[in-house]
Design a protein with these regions (language model features):
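PAPS-dependent sulfotransferase catalytic domain
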Residues: 2-153, 163-193, 266, 272-279, ...
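Helix N-terminus capping/helix-initiation residues
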Residues: 95, 154-155, 230, 246
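Acidic, glycine-rich loop-and-strand cores that form catalytic or ligand-binding grooves
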Residues: 153-159, 202
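Short, flexible loop/turn segments with low-complexity composition
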Residues: 219-227, 275-284
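The conserved 3'-phosphoadenosine-5'-phosphosulfate
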Residues: 62-82, 186-261, 265
């Protein structure tokens, strides 16, 4: 994507959102309506997050402004400045829904600390995310920066090892990736939703979210039971063009005992900090 293409798409976005705001009588709504921002890591269930946000727009006065995420890097352009990313965030008004892949650096943490923001962060088991990234690079993204290196490795065990440790100049190790997002877990405006809960405990997870949004000033148009049915129907991970498997714990079929040892050595207490294990004694 060229920078000109990106700017043209942005101009179309402004026109589209203006129409949606008018259609929902945007300026007659309560001034305490939050701005909802969904945040995730790549290959951590972000399509499920997008479906959830779209479902919320259907049952509330929130406006899903753009299905395209806010990114810190763009294809064929490369890294974007934090100022460019902040401008994208600044276009979101109260009552808007946006989403993106934003690491937890002070610039973004501070920008979204304002009381008008409601940050919905989607987390996923690092082991499942790692496997998902490998299959995505090999099967679905011919231009993925990690693909050539993965293809040079003869076994899945070695590919997992490389993903755990990282490859200098190509990809971060899994610990570094999660460290760069960990600040969202303790951010004052953030509510964390686990991808696993959206798959295995969806009713409970959606109920908790809808009730919390209500306390934040976002009311549903319909009774809660109907709202929850609507949200449940909106979520179908298999409809994602990059879908492979939404089954939590699928890493167990791919890791070897060696990979488990390498993961523990490389990540320390990462799984405990993210709530995926209670201690370091986990195994296949």
């Amino acid at each position: 994507m060229s920078r000109l293409t990106h700017e043209l798409r942005r101009a179309k976005w402004e026109l589209r959102v203006a129409g949606r705001r008018t259609a929902k009588r945007r300026f007659r709504r309560r001034p305490d309506m939050p701005t909802l921002f969904g945040c995730a890591m790549a290959k951590s269930g972000s399509h499920a997050l997008s479906q959830l946000l779209e479902g919320l727009a259907a049952i509330t006065d929130l406006i899903y402004t753009d299905m395209h995420p806010i990114r810190t890097r763009l294809p064929q352009i490369g890294a974007r400045s934090s100022e460019e990313v902040l401008r994208d965030l600044g276009r979101l008004r109260r009552g808007d829904i946006g989403w993106g892949y934003l690491p937890a650096i002070p610039t973004y943490l501070d920008a979204l600390a304002d009381p008008r923001w409601y940050v919905l962060f989607l987390s996923r088991d690092p082991r499942d995310k790692l496997i998902s990234e490998i299959h995505y690079a090999l099967r679905m993204h011919p231009k993925h920066g990690f693909r050539e290196h993965l293809l040079s490795l003869p076994t899945m065990e070695e590919r997992i090892s490389a993903s755990i440790s990282g490859v200098p100049g190509i990809i971060k190790g899994i610990a570094g990736i999660y460290e760069s997002y960990q600040g969202w877990l303790s951010h004052p405006r953030t509510r964390v939703v686990r991808f696993e809960d959206l798959i295995l405990e969806r009713g409970r997870a959606l109920t908790t979210l809808v009730e919390d949004l209500g306390r934040a000033g976002v009311q549903t148009h319909v009774p809660q039971a109907e709202a929850l049915r609507s949200l449940d129907a909106a979520m179908s991970p298999s409809k994602s063009p990059t879908f492979r498997s939404a089954r939590p714990g699928g890493w167990r079929a791919e890791f070897t005992a060696r990979n488990v040892m390498e993961f523990k050595q490389a990540t320390g207490d990462l799984l405990q900090r993210w709530g995926y294990e209670t201690d370091k004694d986990w195994a296949l």
